[in-house]
Amino acid sequence: MAFTSKLKVRFADIDWARVVYFARFFDFAHRTFEDFFNEHAKLPYAAVLADRKVGFPIVSSTAEFFVPLRLGDTARVQMEVLKLSKRSVTSRFTLYKDETDERCAVIVLKQAAIDTSTFTGTELPDDIHALLSAHLVAA
């Protein structure tokens, strides 16, 4: 089951060619990851980092780009968990131009779980593992 977030393309997101700068697609993916916690899980991402002391640095990423997004477009971002272990999560973020349903990009991120007080690897807390597990897609 995919989690979906919608993000409006703003002036700060575009480059000189008037399309979304490629690095912003990674930002859109991470904002969707944060929204997953904030909106779907009702577990504020800031609290996960600060109070729960669990962080998710990216250890691997891939991207494919298909159709540009432009100022004023709405990006619909679908997040699916591809792989989940006790210490990491690999998620796919498929970005669509909401107005036309065109697929714009696919970003895959592998994120390790770390203890934010020591910046060392750690296991995912059981509740967070369960939240992510509910969005695991069949291979």
Model-derived regions: residue spans:
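Hot-dog-fold acyl-thioester-processing enzymes
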Residues: M1-V59, D115-A139
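Generic structural detector for well-ordered beta-strands
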Residues: K6-R10, E64, K110
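Intrinsically disordered, low-complexity segments enriched in small/polar residues
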Residues: V9, V19, A63, S91-T94
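Hydrophobic beta-strand-centered segment that forms part of the acyl-chain substrate-binding groove
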Residues: N38-L84, V89, I107
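HotDog/MaoC-like acyl-thioester-processing domains
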Residues: P68-T74, V81-A139
